[in-house]
Structures are given as C-alpha cells and as structure tokens.
C-alpha cells in the first residue's frame, strides 16, 4: 500500500458536514486543529476496498464518519458508552457497538480487519492488550494509533512497540490539539511490511518536530522513575 502523504492534505471533508448533529463536532471534523487527522482517516479508507475497518473508541463518531468515506468498506466501531452529540445521519456502512470488544467476544473481528483505528482510554493498558492480541494471533493488517504523545503512558506504550512503526505526527495531530496545547500524535504499526510511505513534497514543520523532541525528552526523564510495563 503506497501512502502519498501530500495527497492527505487534498482530502475534501465538506460533504460529511450534513451528517453531524451539532456545530461543535462539525468544527472537530472541518477546522484546525485536527482536520488533518480526519483527512488521514478518509485517505486511508480509500486505499483499501471491500474490507473491514475496526475502530476502538467511537465517541461522537466523527472518526468513524471519516473512515466511512469509501462506501465499499464496513466500519465496526466500539465504545463503552454512547455520546449524546453523536452523528444523526449514520452512513449505512457504519455499525456502532456499545461495549469492550473483548467483553463482547468480538475480538476475532480485529484479525479480520484490514485497518484498525485505536483511540481509547490513553492509559496504555487497553492499547497494550490490543497489541498483544494482534501479535499473538499473527495479525497481518495495519494498526493506526491515535494520540501517541498524549501523555507519558501513551508514549511509553508507543516506544515499546517492536513491530515496524511509522510516526505520522507531522501529518496528523501535530497542530497542538493535545493536552495544554501540545501535540497529541499519530502512529501506524505495519504488521506485514505492506506500507510504502512517500513523504516527498511534505514539509515537516520545525515547530512540530521541536515539540516532539521536547515531549520525548520530558517522557524520557519521567521514565527513569516509572517502571515501563509495556512489553510485547
């Protein structure tokens, strides 16, 4: 799968606006900071066809909506509870599920999915449970992880991943939409070495790369005092 990063910026999400019930979530989808995150989801959905995409962490459904951009794919999205400001016109290729995917005994769907989008508790525990399950069962698809710099636990989890991984923070979630205006980060885990990244003609902003550097430094010093439990 060839991912041409400059093409991510060309994704037009305006047609999705009428599927969202309130202005707050319209702004999440269509305005900075954060729009490049949804552009990336929409772009990735169009790179695969007739496939299952699993999202872990629905919230209002804006990410699921972006993932549904390719109508040939089925999106199974999971969250522990519904959101009162959810999408009102849910596309027919999105199926919403309430509950932990493991508690619902739906975890085999992870192995069937070509793409998994992981955006859950940001404490590293559930994220690590998913990663261990995928490795144990020889998953061959792609895992997209949201907010890899959200906090120290997420960064330790991301850093401990031994599979091939690609940091895409400079293209998505590098606009200061994390805690206290920091970047929150995006990463891809490529379990079968199927991704070819073309980052030509993409300017890596000095401000974003500088923030990444200082966050890594901050979390490194914190890790001296915190035992890293994310081993896979």
Q: Over which residues does each language-model region extend?
A:
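A short alpha-helical cap/connector motif
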Residues: 1-117, 121-144, 148-232
């Amino acid at each position: 799968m060839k991912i041409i990063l400059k093409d991510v910026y060309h994704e037009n999400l305006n047609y999705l606006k009428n599927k969202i019930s309130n202005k707050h979530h319209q702004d999440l989808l269509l305005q900075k900071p954060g729009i490049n995150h949804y552009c990336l989801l929409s772009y990735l959905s169009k790179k695969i066809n007739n496939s299952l995409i699993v999202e872990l962490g629905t919230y209002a459904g804006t990410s699921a909506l972006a993932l549904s951009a390719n109508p040939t794919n089925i999106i199974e999205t999971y969250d522990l509870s519904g959101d009162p400001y959810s999408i009102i016109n849910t596309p027919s290729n999105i199926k919403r599920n309430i509950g932990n995917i493991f508690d619902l005994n739906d975890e085999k769907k992870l192995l069937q999915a070509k793409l998994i989008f992981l955006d859950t508790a940001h404490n590293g525990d559930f994220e690590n449970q998913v990663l261990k399950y995928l490795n144990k069962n020889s998953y061959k698809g792609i895992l997209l992880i949201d907010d890899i710099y959200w906090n120290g636990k997420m960064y330790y989890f991301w850093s401990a991943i031994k599979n091939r991984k690609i940091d895409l923070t400079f293209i998505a979630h590098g606009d200061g939409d994390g805690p206290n205006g920091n970047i929150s980060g995006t990463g891809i885990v490529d379990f079968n070495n199927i991704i070819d990244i073309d980052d030509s003609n993409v300017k890596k902003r000095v401000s974003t790369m500088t923030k990444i550097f200082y966050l890594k430094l901050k979390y490194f010093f914190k890790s001296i005092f915190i035992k890293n439990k994310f081993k896979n």
